[in-house]
Amino acid sequence: MNCLSRRLSHTLSAKSAIAAALALLFSTAAGGAAAATPGNDPVALGQIRNAALQSNWAYERLEDLTDLIGPRLAGSPGAAAAVTQVADAMRKLGAKVTLQPVKVPHWVRGVETASLVDYAGRPAGLSQKVVLSALGGSGATPAAGLRAQVIVLHDLDELKARAAEVKGRIVLFDVPFDQTMADHGLAGQAYGQGVLYRGLGTRLAAQAGAAAVLVRSVGGADFRLPHTGSSGLQDGARIPAAAVAAEDAMLMSRLAKRGPLTMQLTLTPQILPDTDSFNVIADLPGTDKADEIVIVSGHLDSWDLATGANDDGTGVTSAMAVIETLKKLDFQPRRTIRVVAWMNEEIGTRGAQAYVDANKALAEKHVAAIENDEGSGRVFGMRTSVPAESMKLFAPLRAALLPMGAAGFQRTDVLGTGDLSGLERAGVPSFSPLIDDSTYFNYHHTAADTFDKVKPEDLRRHVAVMATTAWFLANMNEPIGRTPAPPAGERGR
């Protein structure tokens, strides 16, 4: 049994799950009309699961989003087109659609080139190109670029110890992504270790007087792909910052061991005035508890290097498909199921904050929130921040997901996933699909995050887990409690 299997198996209540699963297996084969609000009986849960597993609606919407629009960085024409496309698709389903205004940052990538122009042993007249990509929020070099010596660092302690050497130089944080952790079901933790340098590391380098800062790309595969992402730079100290392909970071480390290493770097991004955008909100109204809300969500924006199929096209289209699945079955939930396509997750989560600000008085009416933002790998169940004493209430849901091998439920005190962090701080229990993300960071934030990387059968499984979970939450009789507020600043990826 591998680590992921052990992690999932200990969460299952075998006796209750198997008993309920047997009921499902004998009852869900029959089709036919269903009551408008059938509740959480095994037949209804099985019908939702099976309907989702047989539909390619989300996959078709993903193709529309990625192939017809392309990149969707907040503030860009692509992001605006995506808002219109998603809103239109949800209106066609009969959902009640609202566009919630959000002021978003408008960062534009410019020229990005780099070469190693001087190093020990360099043949006269030669230089070596470095593959890199500017980080979100990066400052710019002069138009003609800057030339400076590179100092290679391997952790923040080394930055502190060598602070006197940093001023006026180009800092490179050469910290490899731990693919072994990713292969053993800990890709998120591996990413967290690396992203520390893209965030805090860039800010500390700027404070130390660096002329520019580079980070080794936070991701696996190492196919000379730079992985972009948000920097930790702040106004008043926005030095040029970029992610370097892993192979180039290793090359620079080797050359720096031979002697002084000089780079010619040109980055010309711009930070334009904030612009208007929107969260897309689509409601499937409830019945007797219509004033209570269950959110199902993904983020609509993407980075500008690719079409954001995995990050987060699959998340937003699987959320949209929850309403499509229930509409197809003519099921109406007791509580309102609200699909939210968040805007601006990648550079600041302003869409999520706008939603929290607008709904402070209604926080208690938000029963639960689901976000799918960890790629399109095979899903095995759910992670959740519900109180420990509420976990037993989910045995019927786990039983419904057991036939498709997605009954694993993993509880954590703080889920803190991106767009849901503000709701979680308000006490709203959060859920996120438990996904095999061992290869997710091969493509994450790169030019290779494209539609062809998504398997339709895996996306169908995402929809099945999300739709069944959303329905279950929307029809529960028992309260599931509130989540204790996480520490300030706690958030996911």
Show the residue positions of the predicted features.
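Alpha-helical metal-binding/catalytic segments enriched in His/Glu/Asp
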Residues: 90, 197-198, 205, 280, ...
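Metal-dependent peptidase/peptidase-like ectodomains
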Residues: 53, 91, 121, 143, ...
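Bacterial N-terminal signal peptides
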Residues: 15-29
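N-terminal capping segment at the start of a domain
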Residues: 39-76, 102, 225-233, 301, ...
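Noncatalytic luminal/extracellular "stalk/propeptide" segments of secretory-pathway proteins
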Residues: 37-44, 63, 67-183
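Soluble metallo-hydrolase cores and metallopeptidase-like ectodomains found primarily
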Residues: 43-44, 119, 129-164, 231-309, ...
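Active-site-adjacent substrate-binding region
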Residues: 206, 212, 216-217, 234, ...
